Amino acid sequence: MINCGDVYKVIEAMVPLYVALILGYGSVKWWHIFTRDQCDAINRLVCYFTLPLFTIEFTAHVDPFNMNYRFIAADVLSKVIIVTVLALWAKYSNKGSYCWSITSFSLCTLTNSLVVGVPLAKAMYGQQAVDLVVQSSVFQAIVWLTLLLFVLEFRKAGFSSNNISDVQVDNINIESGKRETVVVGEKSFLEVMSLVWLKLATNPNCYSCILGIAWAFISNRWHLELPGILEGSILIMSKAGTGTAMFNMGIFMALQEKLIVCGTSLTVMGMVLKFIAGPAAMAIGSIVLGLHGDVLRVAIIQAALPQSITSFIFAKEYGLHADVLSTAVIFGMLVSLPVLVAYYAALEFIH
């Protein structure tokens, strides 16, 4: 049962995030410390340095031999349900959109498990719940965030059903002075995929999770410890991962004209996807695979955790609905505690 001390631990984990957010906001809005170009540089610092090292640090310390693979399978099934629904919506609905499907997937599935989920899960269901939340977070970093990067790179490469088959470009021949028309065909699927895989291969967010989980297998199989010099080299930057991400979000907010930059309707949509659609899909996947008791409850609770900060960083870097995801992170953390407590109370009736 949750008591006041447990609630305080959750608040204790969340308040420092808002301190970093306010400092980032004030550095641009009030104190004018950073220019817009410098703000973009800060986002790239977070995206390509602190977050990859943060990912290595927490994935390297998980025990992959003691994971609850039925719980992981339920998570996979819930994501498949969401992807299927979004794909059908994008293809057959008049309002369907490939870009909005990506953002909706992020809102439904990607959670802030480590910062908010761990203290809350421990307060609700004990150490077993903490282990499950950490496993979910590691799997999210390895699979779902990598998948998100793939579709973002795919979108950036320009291959979509909306591409026109040929583009006419007017060019002036300097020698003759005549205007010539050059026809540029769209890239082939193989060319686009080659470009996407090349980008992913050089993106530290992709191979950081692979390095982390590879070391986790090696260290737990042969009982090895990471040398202190390597551990320290990773920690020196990884400790700043969450703080710099929230600081960067504050900077993004300060650069916008409004505090709620995406508007009320999109904010409500984000909250519905985050706290209703995601947990509902997880509940279906968990029940289908036979989860029960506290494992079922933890599965649903962790799906209702606030929005992943990393999803905002990627959205900002790739220019896709960063306003919606920043609002989802900020307001999601504000409303998450009462929502999760309500879920906790309701799930007590499930056996």
Swiss-Prot record:
The induction text for this entry reads: Down-regulated upon auxin treatment. Down-regulated by endoplasmic reticulum stress treatment.
Residues passing through the membrane, by range: 7-27, 39-59, 71-91, 100-120, 132-152, 210-230, 234-254, 271-291, 295-315, 329-349
Locations listed in the record: Endoplasmic reticulum membrane; Cell membrane
Gene ablation phenotype (knockout): Defects in lateral root initiation and in root and hypocotyl growth. Increased levels of endogenous free auxin.
Q: How does it sit in the membrane?
A: Multi-pass membrane protein
Indicate whether Endoplasmic reticulum appears among the record's keywords.
yes
Annotated signal sequence range: none
One GO biological process term is: endoplasmic reticulum to cytosol auxin transport
**Matching InterPro entries, A to Z?**
Auxin_eff_plant (IPR014024), Auxin_Efflux_Carrier (IPR051107), Mem_transp_PIN-like (IPR004776)
- List, in alphabetical order, the Gene Ontology terms for molecular function in this entry: auxin efflux transmembrane transporter activity; auxin transmembrane transporter activity; identical protein binding; protein homodimerization activity
GO CC terms of this entry: cell periphery; endoplasmic reticulum; endoplasmic reticulum membrane; plasma membrane
Q: Which UniProt keywords apply?
A: Auxin signaling pathway, Cell membrane, Endoplasmic reticulum, Membrane, Transmembrane, Transmembrane helix, Transport
Q: In which tissues is it expressed?
A: Expressed in elongating parts of hypocotyl, cotyledon vasculature and guard cells. Detected in root pericycle and root tip and at later developmental stages in leaves, stems and flowers. Expressed in veins of mature leaves.
- Pfam families this protein is in? Mem_trans
Name the PANTHER family for this protein.
AUXIN EFFLUX CARRIER COMPONENT 1B-RELATED, AUXIN EFFLUX CARRIER COMPONENT 5
Stated role: Auxin transporter regulating intracellular auxin homeostasis and metabolism. Mediates the auxin transport from the cytosol into the lumen of the endoplasmic reticulum. May also act as an auxin efflux carrier when located to the cell membrane. PIN5 and PIN8 may have an antagonistic/compensatory activity. Involved in unfolded protein response (UPR) activation. Involved in the control of vein patterning. Promotes vein formation. PIN5, PIN6, and PIN8 control vein network geometry, but they are expressed in mutually exclusive domains of leaf vascular cells.
Task: Give the family, as the similarity comment puts it.
Answer: Belongs to the auxin efflux carrier (TC 2.A.69.1) family.
Q: What is this protein called?
A: Auxin efflux carrier component 5
Provide the species name. Arabidopsis thaliana (Mouse-ear cress)
